[in-house]
Every structure is written in C-alpha cells, then in structure tokens.
C-alpha cells in the first residue's frame, strides 16, 4: 500500500469518526465583542469545524476583525439582511456539516463544547437536538443556568432552551424548516417548538456549552 493510499484511508476514518460541525455567527456592528466569539470557535478542542460568519453590513470595524481571521473562516459575507433570522437562515444555507450551531457575535463557546456535542451526536444521531447549560455574564457577575429535559408544558411557559447552546443536525432543518423571518425576536422559540411537535428529541447536556452577555 502506498503512503498516499494510507493517508486517504486515514482521512476517511477521521471524517467518519469526527463529524463536521458547522458554526454560524451573525453580526452587526460588534467590534467590541466579535473577536472573543471568533476565538472561541477557532480555538476549540475539536478540529472538524466549518465556520460561517454572516455580517449585516457593519460600519464600525467589525469587518476588519473578520478579515483578520479569514484564513480560519470557511465563508463570510457582509451585506444588508432582513433581520437576525434572515441572517441565520443565510448561514444555514451555506452549512455543509452534520450539525449546525449558531452563536451570536456577543456570545462565546466553552472550549470543549464541540467535542462534547460531537461525541453525543455519534451516539444518538440525527433525530436529536442537542443543548446544554449557559453562563450569563453581567460585568464580573456570572450565573450558571441549567436547561434540563423538557415537556410540552415547558414551552407554554416560554423559551426554555438557551439558543447559544443549541446544536441542530442539518437533517432536522431539512425536516422542520429553518427560522420563520416573520418573527423579530421569537423565531428561535418558534423553531424549537416546531422541533418538539415534529418528534425531534431534545438531548440535554449537563455542562456549560456557551456564555452570554446580558
């Protein structure tokens, strides 16, 4: 067997064992925070990452920061959009990974988030939506909030899954659709409810996945 053939087999095994995770960041005039977001993605303890940034036409220097890391970014664009959910949908349309995470430009991931999600995905597959705990950050004050397993009554009480912690198999988007752009602030809640009503199971991860500034 040639060296080239052995390398091809090794690459195939790696791709099979480590599913590609697509990550979408949407941004607009986020110069103060987006660099931390980007670093939390590209410095993950996991290498099979496709990183997509959809910027809404920032004018404050955000694009300069994106360009600083564009060798680590699979796709990015800066153009006007029709709101946050339109931007998220643009990112999803460019995603080719098995799983998609969405993180806004003022939030950031824990360094082991992707490895944790990928490990569960390999065990559970495409019929689950993966989510975990979040850390709220207000200045120096930090609060961990959990998001345990859900039932339908939880949805009627309001949003009960923290969107920055959510990872959705691309197959789920194909089944239930993407975000409804008719919503201005509740599109993520609508999407999660559609998942639940379409028998997508929610897999809770008992650890902090992401951090959110409040």
What are these regions (language model features)?
Residues 4, 8-214:
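Nucleotide-sugar donor-binding/catalytic module of glycosyltransferases
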């Amino acid at each position: 067997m040639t060296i080239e053939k052995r390398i091809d087999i090794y690459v195939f095994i790696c791709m099979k064992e480590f599913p590609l995770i697509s990550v979408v960041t949407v941004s607009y005039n986020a110069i103060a925070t987006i660099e931390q977001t980007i670093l939390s993605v590209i410095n993950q303890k996991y290498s099979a990452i496709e990183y997509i940034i959809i910027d809404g036409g920032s004018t404050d220097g955000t694009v300069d920061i994106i360009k600083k890391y564009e060798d680590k970014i699979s796709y990015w664009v800066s153009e006007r959009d029709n709101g946050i959910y339109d931007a998220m949908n643009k990112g999803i349309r460019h995603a080719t990974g098995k799983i998609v995470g969405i993180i806004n430009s003022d939030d950031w991931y824990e360094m082991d988030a992707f490895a944790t999600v990928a490990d569960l995905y390999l065990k559970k597959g495409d019929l689950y939506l993966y989510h975990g705990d979040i850390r709220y950050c207000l200045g120096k004050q930090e609060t961990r909030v959990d998001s345990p397993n859900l039932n339908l009554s939880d949805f009627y009480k309001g949003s009960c899954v923290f969107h920055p912690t959510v990872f959705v198999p691309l197959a789920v988007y194909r089944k239930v659709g993407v975000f409804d752009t008719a919503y201005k602030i509740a599109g993520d809640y609508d999407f999660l409810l559609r998942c639940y009503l379409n028998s997508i199971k929610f897999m809770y991860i008992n650890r902090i996945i992401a951090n959110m500034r409040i």
